[in-house]
Amino acid sequence: MTETVNAARLLREQGVTAPAGFRAAGIAAGIKASGKRDLALVFNEGPDYGAAGVFTRNKVKAAPVLWSQQVLTTGALRAVILNSGGANACTGPGGFQDAHATAEAVAAALSDWGTETGAIEVAVCSTGLIGDRLPMDKLLAGVRTIVQDMAGGLSGGDDAAQAIMTTDTVPKQVALHHPGNWTVGGMAKGAGMIAPSLATMLCVLTTDAAVDPVALDTALRRATAATFDRLDIDGACSTNDTVLLLASGASGITPAQADLDDAVLRVCDDLCAQLQADAEGVTKRVNVTVTGAASDDDAVVAARTIARDSLVKTAVFGSDPNWGRVVAAVGIAPIALDPDRMTVSFNGSAVFADGVGTPGAREVDLSGPDIDITVDLRLGDGRATVRTTDLSHGYVEENSAYSS
C-alpha cells in the first residue's frame, strides 16, 4: 500500500530497515516447536543511539520488560533482541537472569562482530505463553547466529517482522518517507490480549532523524496515547507490552518536534490498523467514536466501555444493528451523560435519538467488514475513537486452546 499525504510516502512493503543506519534479521532458533522464525534482532549502526520506550501498565511485568525499562534509563540503545514462542513472564529471578544473559550474549556477539557493545545498550523483548522459562541453550545459540545474519535493505526487516509473530497470521510493518529526506519505520506483532495500556504487542520503531532521547520520548508518548492505547480487542492487558523508538541520526537531519510527532503518529496509526485487521478470530473491524463528551477523557472512557462490551461485540459479529446494547454499554460508563440528548449511529445511519430508537433502525445493514459506531453525547467538545473488533467463534476457539 502506498499513500501520499502532505507529500510523505507511507509504504507497508518496508519496515525497520527503511531508515538509514539500521540492520535487522529474523531466524528460527528452535524456540517454537513449529520450526518457524522465532528470534529477531534490530541493530542501530549509528552514528546516534538515542532511544525511548513505553511499556505495559500491568502490575505483573515480564522479565524482559523489567530489563528493558532499566536499560532505557540511559536514553540509548544499540540493539533490540526479540523472541516469540515464550513470554518469560512470571518466571521469577531466574527469568530476569535469562533476560540479562540474553542481552549479554547479544552484546558479546556484536562486539565480536566489530561493534563494541555493552549489555546496557541492548533491550530484550519476549512474547508467547506466560509461565515457562525460555530454552536458553537454543536462544543463546540463536543470538550468535542472528548477528551474522543481519542485513540492511528490505529483507532483514521482513524476516524480523515474521520472527516476532505468535498468533498473528501476517507480519506487520510500515515506513514513512518524509519529504525532508528522513524516514520512520516500524514493525509490530499482536493479535489478541490487546487492550489500552498498549496491547499484547511488541513494536519497534526506527528513524534516521538526528533527534535526542527527550524528543523521541515526547513523540512516542503522544503517538501511543492516540493509537495503541486506543486499540482494544479483548480487554486483556499483557505482561509484555513494549514499544521502542530508536534513532540512528544517519540522515543528519533534525526535524521540528511537530514533524517528528506527526511521522511517528502516522506510523503507529498504520501499525495499529494492521493489528486490528489481524486480531484473533476477527470478521469485522469496528471503530467506536464518541463525540460531544464533557471532555476528551470522558470520550475515551465511554468509547472504551462500548468497545469492551461483549454484547456489543457479539451483536456486531451477527450483523445485528442492536442499538440497545450500545446504549446500555455507554450508560454504565463513569461519565456525565443524558440519554434523552445523546444519539447513536451505525455506519452513518441514526439508530437512536431523543431517548428512543429511530424508524428503520433495525434494518441498518451491518453485513460488511468495517463497522463504525458513533455516539454523540451532545454535552461538550470531547471526542475520541477506540478501535476494536467483533467477538467471534474463532476468537473463543483460538484462545481456549492457546496453551496446548
Curated annotation (Swiss-Prot):
GO terms for biological process: L-arginine biosynthetic process; ornithine biosynthetic process. The record marks T127, G128 as: Involved in the stabilization of negative charge on the oxyanion by the formation of the oxyanion hole. CDD domains: OAT. InterPro entries: Arg_biosynth_ArgJ, ArgJ-like_dom_sf, ArgJ_beta_C. Substrate binds at T166, K189, T200, E280, N399, S404. Keywords: Acyltransferase, Amino-acid biosynthesis, Arginine biosynthesis, Autocatalytic cleavage, Cytoplasm, Multifunctional enzyme, Transferase. GO terms for cellular component: cytoplasm. It is found in: Cytoplasm. Belongs to the ArgJ family. NCBIfam families: ArgJ (TIGR00120), PRK05388.1 (NF003802). Heterotetramer of two alpha and two beta chains. This is Arginine biosynthesis bifunctional protein ArgJ. The gene is argJ.
